[in-house]
């Protein structure tokens, strides 16, 4: 008798597995008996939020997922979008929040490893990575340790694997003190006629284990990722996986070689819930059963139980359904790369998930109910209470607006992230055109192609807290804007929805309205969601994170030689504001960090205006009218002007329109706006083009001198701006 299956199932054990009483009763009804301990673990893993999306699936179905360039939407390992010339971009963003809080280095590293596998499992070679990171308050005793560990883990894995990090975000807020967020994005390039999917096909075909050996690391990781934290957090350290980027690199090359051979029927990486999830997903999608023999699984630890082998989340592993006639050639490829290749089972026609260990059947369950027919909830939700818009006149104007700008540039959220991204290899593969520190990262598709891909990741959690619907819209719109500032056409997006406990109606309401806002923005901006991830129960001792629906997007440049950057402005260029002058100070960085107030509604997002302005900006870039472009977001016009000055090392002399109070015009965070550095000879053409396309422009000034001079308000030298901007992070990390 398998030792773990001698364990009596008690209410305590059921609760430890994250299953509710009604869910356990459903299991009893489904299988007509009490589950074994291993079967209970399998149900726990497959029915938790991390794998089943049981609280969010109803609402995720409302998102737009189709488009003229979409090849594969949600439901596969990653989304796939056509980029022409027989090629496609494969991409996804996924969270590794809970593990990264428990063990920051390995949690973040294996988050990168997992998303890399999601992409190359489909036949794509990874070409770009991003990460969106949220940490607690800078003065919290764990924050610096977590920042150091997470950044080191991301760099350690992605640098060793050999994928450039081209962008990302880092923010701080006390609401993340007990639950940091680590959202990792990877994109790869594949041939459109050589994509590989996870749907198993054919009866009696071998199921093959590929990659590294199985250990006890990560056992129960998927269940842990679907639960709130409490004071026992340190006890969960063993549920964090350990990664090896060099093995992953070998796995990439072996998989791509195997795919070239034509041996793959279906393939799935072993991520959350490990062998259980990969086997169940492949079988359930293909309406087939799967039978496994654990005696043939390569293990690195002695006396592993069936429970441990089925739920281990050891890294750098794949599961494949193989064409049997190519077994010898396939095995030779993996052995050449120093990886394990073991036939551990077969496909069957009985829709059962059966597992054998030491001559005993330890699992016999219906595969569809484990997989795509897992429970789905329509949880109660309450509509978020909307805040009223703040009038600029009701927000205090500080005496020295220049000092306010310097304070913001030297703050946790607005300062340079150079300390972070200089730990990442941003140039490996040799195709990076725009590196971190700009609105979007850009890479060439190849050194023989004029085409390039642009990437951005965005969300403003404080907006989402104040109004989840507008916050969801704004996250999409800002990502779309950032891609547009390079001249790239936004193609599609992936979402990473990070929220608290969905069993609380107010939290579920945040999720519902954020998804509604995301959906509306994606529909109007023609920016479909093709993949994604939901991370719930981001709470510690009942305190939830800020609602954080991260949006990462991809755009296409048909000719990268026409691309512009934030830093490209030249002396004599005209600085033009696209859109109206600032007036909205509700939920602004100015209100929060200068006045220490949290009040008012976030700025509303006019999606039709966003669409018109974005198309205009892309057109004038393609027409060669501008040297530089930058979107206006956190901190408003003042921060955007300062960032252009800092990046270019050149001054700007500008004058406000006086349509709003000075503090509102400088720091208002009105949406749908851009700054352009326009070539002098192109100014009239730009104005005419704006007039014919109903786009509002304001001439602010010109590029000149060595200071940011806002006429009659403040003059700040380029050097003082750079010093304020660059000093905060190194000082915070104790390097000054």
Swiss-Prot record:
Q: Which residues bind ATP?
A: 53, 92, 495, 532
Where is the protein localized?
Cytoplasm
**Is Transport one of the keywords UniProt gives this record?**
no
Listed GO cellular component terms?
Answer: cytoplasm
Q: Which InterPro entries match?
A: PRibForGlyAmidine_synth_PurL, PurL_linker, PurM-like_C_dom, PurM-like_C_sf, PurM-like_N, PurM-like_N_sf
Name the keywords, alphabetized.
ATP-binding, Cytoplasm, Ligase, Magnesium, Metal-binding, Nucleotide-binding, Purine biosynthesis
Residues annotated as binding Mg(2+) 1: 94, 533
Instruction: Look up the EC number in the record and give it.
Output: 6.3.5.3
Give the active-site positions. 50, 96 (proton acceptor)
Query: Which reaction is this enzyme known to catalyze?
Result: N(2)-formyl-N(1)-(5-phospho-beta-D-ribosyl)glycinamide + L-glutamine + ATP + H2O = 2-formamido-N(1)-(5-O-phospho-beta-D-ribosyl)acetamidine + L-glutamate + ADP + phosphate + H(+)
What span is annotated as the signal peptide, if there is one? none
Q: Which residues bind Mg(2+) 2?
A: 118, 269
**Which residues make up the binding site for substrate?**
95-98, 117, 241, 313-315, 535
Function of the molecule: Part of the phosphoribosylformylglycinamidine synthase complex involved in the purines biosynthetic pathway. Catalyzes the ATP-dependent conversion of formylglycinamide ribonucleotide (FGAR) and glutamine to yield formylglycinamidine ribonucleotide (FGAM) and glutamate. The FGAM synthase complex is composed of three subunits. PurQ produces an ammonia molecule by converting glutamine to glutamate. PurL transfers the ammonia molecule to FGAR to form FGAM in an ATP-dependent manner.
Q: Which protein family is it in?
A: Belongs to the FGAMS family.
Assembly and oligomerization: Monomer. Part of the FGAM synthase complex composed of 1 PurL, 1 PurQ and 2 PurS subunits.
Q: What is this protein called?
A: Phosphoribosylformylglycinamidine synthase subunit PurL
């Amino acid at each position: 008798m398998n030792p773990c299956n001698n364990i009596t199932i008690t209410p305590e054990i059921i609760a430890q597995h994250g299953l509710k009483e009604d869910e356990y009763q459903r299991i009893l009804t489904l299988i007509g008996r009490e589950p074994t301990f291993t079967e209970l673990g399998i149900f726990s893993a497959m029915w938790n939020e991390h794998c089943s999306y049981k609280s969010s699936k109803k609402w995720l179905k409302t998102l737009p997922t189709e488009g003229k360039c979409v090849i594969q939407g949600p439901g596969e390992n990653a989304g796939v979008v056509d980029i022409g010339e027989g090629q496609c971009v494969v991409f996804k963003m996924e969270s590794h929040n809970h593990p990264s809080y428990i063990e920051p280095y390995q949690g973040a590293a294996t988050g990168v490893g997992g998303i890399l596998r999601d992409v190359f499992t489909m036949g794509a070679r990874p070409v770009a990575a991003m990460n969106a990171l949220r940490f607690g308050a800078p003065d919290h005793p764990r924050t610096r340790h977590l920042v150091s560990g997470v950044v080191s883990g991301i760099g350690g894995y992605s640098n060793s694997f050999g994928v450039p990090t081209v962008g990302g975000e880092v923010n701080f807020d006390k609401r993340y003190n007990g639950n940091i967020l680590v959202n990792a994005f990877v994109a790869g390039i594949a041939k459109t006629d050589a994509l590989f999917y996870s749907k198993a096909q054919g009866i009696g075909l071998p199921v093959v284990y590929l990659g590294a050996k199985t250990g006890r690391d990560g056992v129960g990781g998927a269940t842990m990722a679907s639960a709130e934290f409490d004071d026992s957090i340190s006890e969960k350290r063993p549920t964090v996986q350990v990664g090896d980027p060099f093995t992953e690199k070998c796995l990439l090359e072996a998989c791509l070689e195997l795919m070239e051979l034509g041996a793959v029927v279906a393939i799935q990486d072993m991520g959350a819930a490990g062998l259980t999830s990969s086997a169940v997903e492949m079988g359930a999608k293909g309406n087939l059963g799967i039978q496994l023999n654990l005696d043939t699984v390569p293990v690195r630890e002695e006396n592993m139980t069936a429970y441990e082998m089925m739920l281990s989340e050891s890294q750098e592993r794949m599961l494949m359904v193989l064409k049997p006639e190519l077994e010898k050639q396939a095995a030779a490829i993996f052995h050449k790369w120093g990886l394990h290749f073991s036939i551990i089972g077969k496909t069957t026609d009985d829709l059962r998930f059966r597992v054998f260990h030491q001559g005993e059947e330890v699992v016999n369950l219906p595969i569809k109910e484990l997989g795509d027919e897992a429970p789905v909830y329509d949880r109660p939700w309450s509509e978020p209470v909307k805040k009223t818009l703040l009038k600029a006149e009701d927000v205090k104007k500080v005496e020295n607006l220049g000092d306010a700008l310097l304070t913001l540039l030297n703050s946790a959220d607005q300062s340079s992230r150079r300390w972070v991204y200089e730990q990442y290899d941003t140039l490996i593969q040799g195709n990076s055109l725009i590196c971190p520190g700009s609105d979007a990262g850009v890479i060439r598709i190849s050194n023989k192609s004029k085409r390039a891909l642009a990437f951005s990741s965005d969300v403003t959690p404080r907006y989402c807290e104040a109004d989840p619907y507008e916050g969801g819209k704004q996250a999409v719109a800002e990502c779309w804007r950032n891609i547009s500032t390079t001249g790239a056409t936004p193609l599609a997006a992936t979402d990473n929805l990070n929220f608290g406990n969905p069993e609380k109606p107010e939290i579920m309401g945040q999720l519902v309205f954020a998804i509604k806002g995301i959906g509306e923005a994606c529909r109007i901006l023609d920016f479909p969601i093709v993949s994604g991830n939901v991370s719930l129960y981001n709470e510690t001792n009942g305190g939830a994170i800020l609602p954080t629906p991260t949006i990462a997007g991809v755009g296409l440049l048909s000719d990268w030689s026409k691309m512009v950057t934030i830093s490209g402005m030249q002396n004599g260029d005209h600085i033009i504001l696209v859109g109206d002058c600032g007036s909205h100070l509700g939920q602004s960085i100015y209100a929060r960090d200068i006045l220490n107030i949290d009040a008012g509604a976030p700025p509303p997002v006019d999606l039709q205006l966003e669409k018109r302005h974005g198309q205009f900006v892309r057109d004038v870039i393609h027409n060669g009218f501008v040297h530089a472009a930058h979107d206006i977001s956190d901190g408003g016009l003042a921060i955007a002007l300062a960032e252009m000055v800092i990046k270019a090392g050149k001054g700007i002399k500008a004058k406000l329109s006086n349509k709003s109070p000075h503090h509102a015009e400088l720091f208002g965070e009105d949406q749908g706006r851009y700054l352009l550095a326009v070539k002098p000879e192109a100014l009239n053409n730009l104005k005419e083009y704006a007039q014919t396309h109903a786009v509002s422009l304001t001439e602010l000034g010109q590029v000149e001198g060595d200071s940011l001079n806002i006429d009659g308000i403040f003059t700040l030298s380029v050097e003082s701006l750079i010093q304020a901007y660059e000093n905060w992070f190194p000082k915070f990390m104790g390097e000054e």
